[in-house]
């Protein structure tokens, strides 16, 4: 629909500020959402409903799992994946999300986990020498866990504890409604679940287009979405 096309164009401009508005931008935006050509409508100033919703939204008790996405960006996962193509091919971010979901008690049939989909490859035990990630994770014992998974998990725990004064489980375990499609993933939270500590670390801010998950991700707060 026009709103999805506009969001895709905005995501492309955010990712590539040098890309000029024009026919080329619209072509790339249409390719992103695979929509037929039509006029782009300007965004509404009212609160818009989640994009591409199912007729009935599913409910999850672990809606905060996707709050991990902005934090992974903060930890530099985009550059990390570019420097470690084997881990990118094995869908490291999906491994991280499902590992955290399991540790926080989300069952395999949780609607959000099903919407994300499972990684298709096992994660290789690639040695990690990324100084930024090693510093963020602090000293840890790797044991039998793939190093990249263990390091990002430790770095996330440390960042959430220091910045929001909560544990990773407290971040993740929060009820939400889930709308999903092949290109979009929207979560709706009750307004009274807004947490200043979580906002302070930017975990509940819209991720927008997330290339390593292949989705446009948006968070909605308010009882009309929950």
Regions from the language model: what does each represent?
Residues 1-226:
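Short, compositionally biased pre-sequence/patch detector
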């Amino acid at each position: 629909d026009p709103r999805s096309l506009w969001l895709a164009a905005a995501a492309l401009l955010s990712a590539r500020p040098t890309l000029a508005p024009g026919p080329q931008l619209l072509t790339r935006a249409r390719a992103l959402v695979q929509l037929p050509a039509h006029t782009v409508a300007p965004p509404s100033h009212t609160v818009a409903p989640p994009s591409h919703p199912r007729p009935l939204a599913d409910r999850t008790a672990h809606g905060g799992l996707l709050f991990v996405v902005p934090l992974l960006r903060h930890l530099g996962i985009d550059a990390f994946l570019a420097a470690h193509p084997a881990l990118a091919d094995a869908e490291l971010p999906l491994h991280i999300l499902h590992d955290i979901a399991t540790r926080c008690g989300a069952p395999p049939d949780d609607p959000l986990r099903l919407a994300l989909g499972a990684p298709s490859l096992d994660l290789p035990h690639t040695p990690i020498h990324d100084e930024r990630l090693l510093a963020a994770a602090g000293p840890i014992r790797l044991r039998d866990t793939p190093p990249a998974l263990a390091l990002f998990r430790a770095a996330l725990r440390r960042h959430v504890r220091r910045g929001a004064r909560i544990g990773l489980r407290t971040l993740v375990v929060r009820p939400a409604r889930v709308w999903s499609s092949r290109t979009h993933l929207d979560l709706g939270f009750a307004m009274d679940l807004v947490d200043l500590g979580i906002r302070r670390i930017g975990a509940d801010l819209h991720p927008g287009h997330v290339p390593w998950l292949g989705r446009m991700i948006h968070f909605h707060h308010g009882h009309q979405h929950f």
